[in-house]
Amino acid sequence: MSGPRFGSGVALLVVDVQNDFAHPKGSLSVRGAEAVIEEINDLIRDARAAGSPVVYTQDWHPPSTPHFDKDGGIWPVHCVADSWGAQFHPKLVLEGPYVRKGVGGEDGYSGFTMRHPVADEPVSTGLHELLREHEVAHVVVVGLATDYCVKFTALEALELGLETTVVRSAIAAVDVESGDGERALAEMVEAGAVVA
């Protein structure tokens, strides 16, 4: 299957390629994550060469948040603001703006919106506004993890009316339960995404 086409109206979204997810010593390391970084870098270069914007998402949590198991959530502490784990993986090519998720303790997985920890209302990360500034109608989604942040970013992109492509060779899954990644891909396809 051929890869995505970049150009006018198309943006590449690089989801959460950070040390805590992508590095083997990360607190929530995703198996196979380092192996997809070069493919992601190739797509970044292709997008930039075609004049497409590249936008990164970055998990950026306070030390205490309902997202963490120590505070009642389900995940180990990860991507705490200004920590090594929150930094982008050193092998990732960085050529574009980024939006941060969870800065104020919000919970969720999408690169577009999170849930306010008290009001339980959506809080924008600024991603949709950034894409509108660039007149983006189609997003290509890559990064980590297939079954969480990639999936919810792709699903919300579709809800916002954006054509959405997910590049199979440039994602990796947490697979808390065996097969979660494949089920997430099927859910994205059912919602209207193209898997390339």
Regions found by a protein language model. Name each.
Residues 85, 89, 124, 128, ...:
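Hydrophobic, well-ordered secondary-structure segments
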Residues 136-152, 166-168:
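Glycine-rich anion-binding loop/nest that anchors nucleotide
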Residues 43-44, 150-161:
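Histidine-anchored nucleotide/phosphate-binding helix
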Residues 77-82, 116-120, 143:
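Short, surface-exposed loop/turn motifs that are enriched in glycine and acidic residues
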Residues 36, 40, 124, 150:
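Aromatic/hydrophobic pocket-lining residues that form the small-molecule binding cavity
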Residues 109, 118-120, 134-140, 153:
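Hydrophobic, aromatic-enriched interface-forming segments
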Residues 93-130:
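Histidine/lysine/aspartate-rich catalytic loop segments that bind and position anionic ligands
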Residues 1-105, 133, 137, 162-166, ...:
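Active-site acidic carboxylates
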